[in-house]
């Protein structure tokens, strides 16, 4: 192999005409014309068409006839300009081809579990092979094949370029990159830790870091001044569709700074990395206080690409004749809603009443929903007669409503429930009516978070216990005062997604001790968990602050990729499992004994292979009862089963699936080893409603996996009838 001569497939141009080139890569596609063989050869830079003609080299042609998809090969040949009319506009190299004179097969490939080629070899058009048609677990099981796809290679390259841009920018600002420990001490940071048992120190454990929080603060106390790290973090969280147990974040900390320093450098950094994906962000980023975000959007991650902010109208309708409102208000409740501008025609009475009021709003937790339309300067609805003219005018003025607008209102004694329901309705309606601008990115700083919140009757940190209170003087035993304290914390939100957050840190030991006391930690607990950190605060700690940005989530947004799993080389699946390596797996008994962990752990069975238990799933993992089937998991099942239903039907389906979990132990205990598979003999029908015909599928995408297409025809399996 003479790798020094190698030319990349995607870099061949007309300037190479007449030259001998050496190509190496994988067979992407094959087309056999009987007396001439064409292949697409793919490498990291692109695809080139190679022609095997027996008149040029009979031996190479004969060997090429044995090629199959994904064989790794080397081709030597001469570059030629394609004849007019045979160019392929879908390839960067579509104007040239290579006539092979020599072929070396490095290694062969088995039949593929799914198609890798993304550009079928066709004339004058491009047929895309979509990974959406392949089960995600199958893609992850054969991740090394999945990553061969050009689109996945492009994502990994872009990821590298984005991280490179981050490093170069921070280097210009005199930040230095320092690695912090992976094997560290377990400290309370919001999620559960992954624990690592120590062989040397029997019965003791390290913890994998949820973030480098304490170490980066210690670096500031060490005089480092400006630190950053592309940090790997680990959190043993409950399963969520777009979370990973291990993830990457940009971790950053600086001394002798305030919030404005963080805002300035992070805005510039964010603008730069988004530009790598062709996305322009407006500066300066607007800022919104936490209280305003909750009051007007029902979330601390508001999507400000569209309007529909909430308004409280309780004072306007407190004496209304509408008994539902009046009763809720008398019980201390609230009436709140938003205005949908110019959508009275799109949101018909049937849609508002029978869909949103009766089904969709209740699926979000509401007991109902009130709606009104503005028609010819007046409100119209099925309950408007209970409102005086003054109340109607007051509602229109408060919402800024005009002709053609629709008012959506929720009433309840729980203000938290109102915010949650309105937040879900706002996003649902905006998505349904396509009110969210495409290819629009609106960053936002959310600041002045509460320092503490109440969980299960106990005070806990809203972010983490190292955030500077505002003001710093407070009584750690005064519950009312604690819950009224703000913090110098801030989150960066883009299009309703939190990309990161940070704060100005506590740099005085007395203040830090008061926070620990407010959280209910005793002196002994404080010393055991944080004694090393408190001692560092006694030696002239500088004012400091920082931020952490989720690299995976940011890259997914920059590249418009729906799942963070597609921007990570080897991610875990939705159940925190690795279908490729089958991690996590049972440990050998000898390893457990060496770690002094005793016999309370499941071990590999002697003589049964690595995954021998009958109570394991197909990936070799012990079957455990899921806590709850989420709406995202319902949508995933529906997609695999080719089911289509609306939100209210999804809620019913979710309820039915969760009810099955009540029988989990019974089903798990059934011995099905000798039971033969049975045919489904029940009538298959939709029990919710009559089936609705879907849109007709185009033929070409349906046949996109057919291996060959010529003269308008695909080769497909022939049906043999007896």
What residues fall within each predicted segment?
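Class II aminoacyl-tRNA synthetase catalytic cores and aaRS-like
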Residues: 1-621
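Domain-scale activation on soluble regions of proteins
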Residues: 79, 610, 614-722
């Amino acid at each position: 192999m003479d790798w020094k001569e190698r030319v990349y497939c995607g870099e061949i141009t007309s300037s190479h005409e007449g030259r001998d080139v050496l190509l190496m890569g994988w067979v992407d596609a094959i087309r056999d014309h009987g007396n001439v063989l064409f292949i697409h050869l793919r490498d990291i830079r692109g695809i080139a068409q190679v022609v095997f003609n027996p008149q040029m080299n009979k031996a190479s042609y004969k060997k090429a006839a044995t090629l199959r998809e994904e064989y790794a090969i080397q081709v030597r040949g001469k570059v030629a300009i394609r004849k007019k009319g045979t160019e392929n506009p879908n390839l960067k190299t579509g104007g040239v081809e290579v006539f092979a004179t020599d072929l070396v097969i490095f290694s062969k490939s088995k039949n593929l579990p799914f198609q890798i080629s993304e550009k079928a070899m066709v004339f004058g058009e491009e047929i895309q092979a979509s990974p959406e048609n392949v089960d995600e677990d199958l893609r992850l099981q054969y991740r090394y094949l999945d990553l061969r796809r050009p689109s996945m290679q492009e994502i990994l390259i872009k990821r590298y370029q984005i991280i490179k841009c981050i490093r170069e920018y921070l280097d210009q600002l005199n930040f230095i990159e320092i690695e912090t420990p992976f094997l560290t001490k377990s400290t309370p940071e919001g999620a559960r830790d992954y624990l690592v048992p120590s062989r040397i120190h029997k019965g003791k454990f390290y913890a994998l870091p949820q973030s480098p929080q304490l170490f980066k603060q210690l670096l500031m106390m060490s005089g480092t001044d400006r630190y950053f790290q592309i940090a790997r973090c680990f959190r043993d969280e409950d399963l969520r569709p777009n979370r990973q147990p291990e993830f990457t974040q940009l971790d950053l900390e600086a001394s002798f700074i305030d919030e404005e320093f963080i805002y300035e450098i992070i805005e510039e950094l964010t603008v730069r990395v988004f530009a790598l994906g062709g996305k322009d962000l407006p500066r300066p980023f607007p800022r919104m206080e936490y209280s305003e975000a909750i009051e007007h959007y029902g979330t601390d991650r508001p999507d400000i690409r569209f309007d529909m902010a909430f308004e409280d109208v309780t004072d306007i309708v407190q004496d209304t004749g509408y008994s539902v409102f009046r009763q809720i208000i008398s019980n201390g409740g609230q009436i709140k809603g938003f205005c949908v501008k110019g959508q009275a025609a799109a949101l018909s009475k049937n849609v508002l009443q029978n869909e949103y009021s009766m089904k969709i709003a209740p699926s979000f937790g509401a007991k109902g929903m009130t709606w009104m339309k503005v028609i010819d300067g007046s409100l119209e609805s099925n309950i408007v007669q209970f409102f005086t003219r003054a109340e109607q005018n007051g509602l229109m003025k408060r919402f800024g409503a005009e002709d053609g607008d629709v008012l959506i209102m929720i009433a309840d004694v729980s203000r938290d429930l109102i915010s949650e329901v309105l937040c879900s309705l706002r996003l649902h309606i905006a998505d349904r009516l396509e009110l969210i601008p495409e290819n629009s990115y609106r960053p936002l700083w959310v600041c002045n978070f509460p320092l503490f919140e109440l969980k299960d009757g106990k005070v806990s940190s809203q972010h983490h216990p190292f955030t500077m209170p505002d003001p710093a003087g407070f009584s750690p035993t005064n519950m009312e005062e604690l819950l009224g304290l703000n913090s110098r914390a801030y989150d960066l939100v883009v299009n309703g997604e939190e990309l990161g957050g940070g704060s100005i840190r506590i740099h005085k030991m007395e203040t830090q001790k008061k926070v620990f006391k407010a959280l209910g930690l005793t002196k002994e607990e404080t010393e055991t968990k944080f004694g090393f950190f408190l001692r560092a605060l006694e030696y002239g700690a500088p004012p400091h602050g920082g931020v952490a940005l989720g690299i995976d989530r940011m890259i997914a947004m920059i590249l418009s990729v729906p799942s963070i799993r597609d921007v990570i080389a080897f991610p875990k699946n939705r159940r925190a499992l690795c279908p490729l390596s089958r991690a996590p797996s049972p440990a050998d008994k000898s390893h457990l004994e060496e770690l002094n962990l005793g016999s309370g752990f499941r071990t590999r069975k002697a003589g049964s292979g690595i995954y021998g238990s009958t109570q394991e799933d197909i990936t070799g993992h012990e079957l455990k009862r899921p806590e709850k089937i989420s709406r995202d998991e319902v949508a995933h099942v529906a997609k695999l089963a080719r089911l289509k239903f609306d939100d209210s039907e999804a809620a019913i389906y979710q309820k039915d699936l969760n009810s099955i979990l009540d029988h989990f132990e019974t089903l798990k205990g059934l011995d099905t080893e000798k039971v033969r598979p049975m045919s489904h003999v029940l009538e298959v029908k939709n029990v919710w409603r009559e089936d609705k015909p879907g849109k007709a599928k185009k033929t070409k995408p349906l046949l996109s996996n057919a291996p060959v297409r010529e003269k308008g025809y695909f080769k497909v399996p022939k049906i043999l009838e007896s």
